[in-house]
Amino acid sequence: MAKIILTQEVSGLGSAGDVVDVKNGYARNFLFPRGFATPWSRGAEKQIESIKQARAARELSSLEDAQALAAKLTSTTLTVPVTAGAEGRLFGTVRAGDIASAVENAGLGSIDKRRVDLTQRIKTTGVYQAVVHLHEDVNANVEFEVVPA
């Protein structure tokens, strides 16, 4: 097991500044090359403290921003234009990135596509819902309509 420091949020592991133990291969082949983590050392322990202090300072304002964005997202129905056939069947599927770009096109701000959780595969036009994880305490249910482009 390797002891590492996360440099950014990794789903299932933790957020930036957390010290976690992972298997050597996962750290060496996935986390380190993508810049998600650095090896743990005593000197890096001091970096962790500064990251955590900065995160705590941002936490309060980001919570308020996330709640404001969640209120906007739940009150708006997004439109996702996709290529579809005559009967409404899509050529492909709607992905989390499509929802994130629809939020940006609607002028509501930008969100990371990794924070969008689609509960089902979308293969036809219609109205659907997704969950957007804006903050660890704030989730927004987003309603969107898939329309032919």
UniProtKB/Swiss-Prot annotation:
Keywords: Ribonucleoprotein, Ribosomal protein, RNA-binding, rRNA-binding
Source organism superkingdom: Bacteria
Keyword Lipoprotein (UniProt): no
GO MF assignments: rRNA binding; structural constituent of ribosome
Coiled coil location: none
One GO CC term on file: ribosome
Cross-referenced NCBIfam families: L9 (TIGR00158)
Entry-linked InterPro entries: Ribosomal_bL9, Ribosomal_bL9/RNase_H1_N, Ribosomal_bL9_bac/chp, Ribosomal_bL9_C, Ribosomal_bL9_C_sf, Ribosomal_bL9_N, Ribosomal_bL9_N_sf
Free-text function comment from the UniProt entry: Binds to the 23S rRNA.
Gene Ontology BP terms: translation
Family: Belongs to the bacterial ribosomal protein bL9 family.
HAMAP family named among the record's database cross-references: Ribosomal_bL9 (MF_00503)
PROSITE patterns noted in UniProt: RIBOSOMAL_L9 (PS00651)
Protein name, UniProt field: Large ribosomal subunit protein bL9
Annotated gene: rplI
